[in-house]
Curated annotation (Swiss-Prot):
The keyword Iron does not apply. The gene is WTF9. Disruption phenotype: Severely stunted shoots and roots, small flowers with very small anthers and little pollen, and very small siliques containing only a few aborted seeds. Impaired splicing of rpl2 and ccmFC mRNAs. Absence of c-type cytochromes, complex III and cytochrome oxidase. This is Protein WHAT'S THIS FACTOR 9, mitochondrial. Its main location: mitochondrion. The keyword Isomerase does not apply. The lineage of its organism: Eukaryota, Viridiplantae, Streptophyta, Embryophyta, Tracheophyta. RNA-binding protein involved in group II intron splicing. Binds specific group II introns and promotes their splicing (e.g. rpl2 and ccmFC). Residues 1-24 form a transit peptide. GO terms for biological process: cytochrome complex assembly; Group II intron splicing; mRNA processing. PANTHER family: PROTEIN WHAT'S THIS FACTOR 1 HOMOLOG, CHLOROPLASTIC (PTHR31476), PROTEIN WHAT'S THIS FACTOR 9, MITOCHONDRIAL (PTHR31476:SF13). It is found in: Mitochondrion. Keywords: Mitochondrion, mRNA processing, mRNA splicing, RNA-binding, Transit peptide. InterPro entries: PORR_domain, PORR_fam. Residues 32-358 form the PORR domain.
Length: 387
């Protein structure tokens, strides 16, 4: 039977047995562009897809599954769209179909048959993967300081965790009895998980180490899998530091960390372990780096937590595409068997394919001189609603 030698989160005093020293090396490794990670399509299009799915959900919630542009034209911030809503919808004719409304010839939108079918498939995935999605949310909360997170944090992580937009609106259906809505300080509403100390929660790194060794694993045996970019060579000093870092005891993100010296090497390894586990929970195993900064207070992260990505480029990759910095966990892409594929990823890839089909449709329209599709409203008709 597999087991792992590690203190439970409820036993805070045991971590005092760890030797907490600080041998800080000012690691600076020149950022090296990696075309493979810069061109992972579902990461590149994730932000735009999020807006597409949010608008899709807004439309299907309507009684007739269609909506006038006037009802959503002022909600660019809600849907995280930087252009006019109508312009954004028209960019994806394979997903959103425009037609003349019942009154005043105003533009309305509904889903195309292809998008409607994909929406159905998406709902099936949510139903069949309900336990998986709930466990991912539970693990996120169990990594927090007191097993509780503000609802605003949970809401902000929904897309990354693969949860539906309305997930928290139906707690009786989506959450089990271990979840509780609580009042936090300053009147903030939170979501807590009651952990009874029964089955120990193991990180992906712990599970993989146990599988590899087929038995009990000590803390010193758990190392981070490294996946350097091609042509990347480290200076001897940095290589020596990295070897020593790997030998440090592993502190699971689900274990108590209150007695760790924040300036110790072990504390840094704990932060890297937290980021590794966090990205393992996410659909694309990636996230905009700035979106993770709000987690510092609730997960005991240092002020300069973003430096962890820079100090460990063989574990994480920072992509600068789309004028933003995206942190990507290398392991799931270089060793596909190491991390389970998120159940929602397949559906998102299908939405992205529809987005790509839209580009072909628009290109075909541009190439057809004088082409005008009947039923498509003149773009000027919605200007009054887009001001």
């Amino acid at each position: 039977m597999l087991s792992i030698r590690r203190h439970a989160k409820t036993v805070a005093s045991s971590c005092t047995n760890l030797t907490q020293k600080r041998t800080y090396v000012d690691v600076y490794m020149k950022w090296k562009r990696d075309p493979y990670f810069d061109n992972i399509e579902h990461i590149l299009r994730s932000s735009q897809l999020k807006s597409v799915v949010s608008l899709k959900n807004c439309i299907v919630q309507e009684p007739n599954r269609c909506i006038p542009i006037s009802a959503i034209s002022k909600k660019t911030r809600q849907f995280d769209v930087s252009t006019k809503i109508a312009h954004f919808l028209r960019k994806f004719p394979s997903i959103f179909e425009e037609f003349v409304g019942p009154e005043y010839n105003l533009p309305w939108f509904r889903l195309t048959p292809e998008a409607t079918e994909l929406d159905r498939q998406e709902r099936v995935v949510y139903q069949t993967s309900a336990d998986d999605l709930r466990d991912r949310l539970k693990k996120l909360i169990l990594m927090s300081k007191d097993n509780v997170l503000p609802l605003s944090i949970v809401q902000g992580m929904k897309w990354y965790l693969g949860l539906p937009d309305d997930y928290l609106q139906f707690p009786d259906m989506n959450l089990d009895s271990s979840f509780r809505f609580v009042d936090m300080e300053d009147g903030v509403k939170g979501l807590a998980v009651d952990y009874n100390g029964g089955d120990k929660v193991l990180s992906v790194l712990q599970k993989n180490a146990m599988k590899k060794r087929r038995g009990e694993v000590s803390l010193e045996e758990i190392e981070f899998p490294l996946f350097p970019s091609k042509g990347c060579r480290l200076r001897v000093k940095i290589e020596d530091w990295l070897m020593e870092f790997q030998k440090l005891p592993y502190v699971s993100p689900y274990d108590d960390y209150s007695c760790l010296d924040p300036s110790s090497d072990i504390a840094e390894k704990r932060v890297v372990g937290f980021l590794h586990e966090l990205l393992c929970l996410f659909v694309e195993h990636s996230a905009e780096r700035k979106k993770l900064l709000c987690l510092k207070k609730h997960f005991g992260l240092p002020q300069k937590v973003h430096k962890a990505f820079e100090r460990h480029p063989q574990i994480f990759y920072l992509s600068m595409k789309n004028k933003t910095c995206t942190a990507i966990l290398r392991e799931p892409y270089r060793d596909k068997a190491s991390v389970e594929t998120h159940p929602v990823l397949g559906v998102r890839k299908k939405y992205i394919q529809l987005m790509k089909n839209s580009e072909l449709i628009l290109k075909s329209r541009r190439n057809s001189f004088g082409f005008r599709d009947e039923g498509v409203v003149d773009k000027d008709l919605d200007l009054d609603f887009e001001g």
